[in-house]
Every structure is written in C-alpha cells, then in structure tokens.
Amino acid sequence: MEPIVYIYQDHLQDFWNSGQSQCFGAAFEWKGEQVYHVYIKYPQVAPTGYSMPCLFRVVDTDDYGKAEDVALSVYASMPEEAKRVPVVIVCIHVEDTKVSSRAFIVDDGRIIEAVVKYVPRKSELYTRSKGLLEVGALESKKVLIVGLGSGGAPIAVELAKAGVGHFILMDFDRIELHNIARHICGVNELGRLKVNAVKDAILLKNPYAQVETYDIDMNKQLDILEKCVAESDLTIVATDEYASRYNINARLVKLGKVGLFGRAIYYA
C-alpha cells in the first residue's frame, strides 16, 4: 500500500508567497495506516497521530523531475537526532503560478514516494453543498450557542458542516463521565471545558471558522450575554436551566433578535 500525504493548499501557497526556499513543519502519522498529515503552520486543533519531522523544500523544474534525489540529499543534511524517526520531505515546484508537490517518507535512509492529496482552500471546502445550501450566505453569519450538552454540541457541529463561519460558544461546564454516552465528545476529552472541546470539533469540520468561547455562568455575567446576543444573527438556547432560558429570552426580546429554544432530559 502506498503511503498518503495530506497537505493544506493554503499552507503551500503561503509558503511560496513568503519567498523562503526551505522550512521545517510538522507531520503526524496514523500509525500502521501509512497516512500522514503535514503542516507548515501548526494546526488550531491538536492533531491525532504520532509526530515526526517534516521539511518543505522549493525546487526548480530540473530538480522536481529528480525530487527523490533532492529528498535524500536534504535528509542527509539533517541533524542525526531528527533521523531517529521517519521524516516527511515535501518538494514544491511552481510553474505559471500553479503549485505542485511531491512527498517522500525517509526512514533510516530508505525512501518511498507518497501519494499527495490536498486539503482544499476555504473557497472550495463546501463545494459539494453549493446548490443545496446557501454556503456563501452562511459563511458570514454568526451563531451564539448557549449550553453545549448533548443538544447544543451536535447543533454546533452540524452548523459548521453547513458552512456557518462564526460561532460564539457559552457554557461553564466540563465534560463529565455521565455526558459521554450521548455527547459528541469521547472519554479522551473528560475534564475539558465544553467550550474548548466543541470549538475543536467545529474546527475539525471547518478549519476556517472563527470561534469565540466563554466558559462563564451567563446568569452572573448578563452584560457579556447581552453583548453576545447583540452580535449574533441567531441564538441557540440549549440550556437545561430555567433562569438562563429566561435571561436569554429577555435579551432576545429587548434586542429584537431571533432565538431557537430546545433542551434535552437532565444529565444529558
């Protein structure tokens, strides 16, 4: 099975525009699956997998044709401590503004070329939804979600999948054991603030989304609640507590804003 390397198109373009000829990045492998995700900029969400060194190198037309030799030469010049694990080397070539790349996995001097696949630019990420959803309109919308249990959390992820570009998340609670059976988060996120865990889930679906988080009890900070309601195009009220629902509703009425109310059974 050929290894596969995933590269962000935006990262490649930004690297080329910077004028650098070489830079170090980070790579993460799904152990045993020969799948590697490589980054020039460290991702917003901590990647899954085992980390390893990664190096990006710009090459001319002649060297691009013999990129394997270039990769071996680059590998030979790397410090010995970097060679204790496999290394991903990406050779980048630009012709007529088109950026192309070849990727190699080098392990103890042995080299194998990988299949390169690209994570698309922001403008292309939701092309399959065009015609079904108004993706362009949703990208500019801001949604406030108060309460990130088994109701609010999946709503946040579904909105991210639909192409909503801006989120405000509000919840003071943490992921607890009793949440796991029905929540989008798993046991590896026990103890995390729900706002941070759900933010990561959003960014895994839409890495270009803008996400603000407030790990507060909004009943005690009503000024922040009112500010967030005022900024948002839609407020999702997914709390299971009467005082918070009353306080949010009062601000929705005061500001003439739209809100959707829903709740799950206790302990969800």
Where are these regions (language model features)?
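Short amphipathic alpha-helical segments and helix-helix/interface helices
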Residues: Y75, K199, L225-E226, I248-V253
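Hydrophobic/aromatic beta-strand patches that form the interior of the parallel beta-sheet core
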Residues: V88-V90, L144, I168-M170, Y214, ...
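ADP-ribose/adenylate-binding Rossmann-like module
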Residues: L234-A268
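A structured beta-alpha segment of the ubiquitous adenosine-cofactor-binding alpha/beta core
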Residues: K199-L234, T239-Y242
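Glycine-rich phosphate-binding loop and adjoining beta1-alpha1-beta2 segment
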Residues: F172-P207
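Short amphipathic alpha-helical segments
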Residues: A156-E158, A181-R182, N247-A250
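Glycine-rich adenosine-cofactor-binding loop
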Residues: G131-E176
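Glycine/serine-rich phosphate-binding loop and adjoining beta1-alpha1 elements at the start
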Residues: M1-K141
